[in-house]
Amino acid sequence: MVAAATQPSETGTLNSVSAGATRMAGFSARLDADPEQLWLGVVGTLIAVLVAGVVFAREVVYDRFIWQYFWGPVAADGNGAQCAVIRNGDVSYLFSTAECAAAERAGEIVAYPGYTLVSEVGYVLVLLLALIGVYFLLRRLDIGDSRSLFYALFPFMLFGGALRTVEDAGIAALAAGSEPLIGFPVSALIISPFIYVTVFAMTLAAVGVGVALERRGVVDAYEYPVAAIGTLLVAGSVGYLTSLAVTTTYVSLRPQVLAVVVIGATLSAAATWLLIERFAPAINAGTGLMGLVLLWGHSIDGVANVVGLDWMPALGAGPNLVP
């Protein structure tokens, strides 16, 4: 199936890659510098500035920037706390909103689970640098110019959601007085936003394995082992969660929620894609069914949020979730 998916209408994909390479070459010529070296220089400079800031201005750079907006929120989430606070050089976890508010009034450095404008801007910059790095990597490996890689990576999209639920199960285990599979601080690797880095690294490793197997003649196409690794990771995560639902009281299986989310997302994605195909086919011309897959992925996210926040009681699945 992966091989067949590479055949129809790849011209748009190839043209996009070629256009990107042309623009990059022009940019490099204007700066009279190798673009990969330029990228490494930017990344290295940013890291050096942060390290220097931590060493020479720890409270400002680490406590009030890195910790408060990036690490602290993850630490609070990983411990099931309402917030995390730096007190006299040590980190404390508070489990009531009143305590968190009192800590803020006292002028202490407080970090809440979730995102802030500062952290979101930081993550956007990291994402942009990462995308540029991925482009250079694909170009160096001479891969990624066909649709087959896109479909091979699809299981990793599902794996990301399943792995994040493993962390949720760990929080539920802590609340029930049980030991989670992955305890803090290791669990930080599967808490947003660090989970994106974790899944990216695992995906990158899978691609590396696939490319190595292809170039050694073990497989005909690197996409096959990539898809197989992703599928095994999804199956392992879902299997673990299912076993918890069967053997513990703090994790429950809600098949009606899964059914509504999958059916609702599939119908909305299909309807949207068909409407685009009917009234604005130029949008789908370069992507084909890849656009449908992308729409379905976003629809899963959207429908799951609506169901979790508003429809849980109606489905007999317990109270609505709290964001």
Task: Please annotate each region the language model reported.
Residues 2-323:
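Charge-biased, low-complexity intrinsically disordered regions
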